[in-house]
C-alpha cells in the first residue's frame, strides 16, 4: 500500500474515532503494510485482519480493540503499543518487539509468539491465551515469575511451595535472572 493511501485511511479513521459519524473506520483487511511506519498512530478498533505488517513500526501505536486476526507481524516493532482487547487470534507475532506493550484482555488464541520480546509487557493470563504458542525463553520467564512470587508469598501453602522448589533450576534459566536475582531456597 502506498504511503499516501495509508495516510488518508488513518486520517479518515481519526475523524471516525471523534464522533463515529464523519470519516470512516479503518479497514485494512489483507493490506500489504510491510515496513509501514504506523508509530504513534491511533488505530483503535481498526480492522487489520490478514494484513501483512512484517517489519512495521508500530511503536506507541494505539491498537486497542483492533481486529488483527491472522495478521503477520513478523519482526514488527510494537514497543509501548496498546493492544488491549485486540483480537490477535491466529496472528504471527514471531520475533516481534512487545517491550512495554499492553496486551490486557487481548485474545492471543493460536498466536505464535516465538522469539518475541515480552519484557515489561502485560500478557493476559486468561483462557484467550491458553493456546498461544510461546517459546522456551518466554516460558522460562513466566515460570521464573510464578516460582519467585509463589515462594515469597505468605499466602501460598507448603504443598504449593514444595512443588515450586522442583522448578527452581528451570526458572533460573530466565534470561534476566541475574538482574532480577536468582531464586534460592
Model-identified regions with their sequence ranges:
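Intrinsic low-complexity/IDR segments
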Residues: 1-35, 39, 44, 49, ...
